[in-house]
Amino acid sequence: MLYLTGLQQGWYALTNHRLGLGFAMAWPVEVFPVLWVWQELCGSRGYPWYHNAYALGLEPCTSFATTGLAGLAEVIQAGRERHLSPGERLTTGLKATIFATDGAPGVAEVTSDGNVKLLERTE
């Protein structure tokens, strides 16, 4: 489990050059300043995975905890919680995009509206 903090922009992109496809996610970093990165590597013994799950999670978050279930108290005590006053609203969104890599070596940027800017190929 890993938390990425201090993000300047809210986006990531994963590419599969063999298939020529990628997946990108963009979000407002001022709302979700943390990216939680986790992996499941056949560790879940019970239903429904029975040691057969290989998964990677990349989740934009409002804050992070380091103590599992006791984490909410930790986040509040450290002042990292996202607080909404009674009646206050927060409307936000995430943008997910599937894109063609077009032989590009990688991704330069994913804009807030989900447009993927590929790196230039150097020959």
Q: What are these language model-derived features?
A:
Residues 82-100:
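Short Pro-Gly-centered flexible turn/kink motifs
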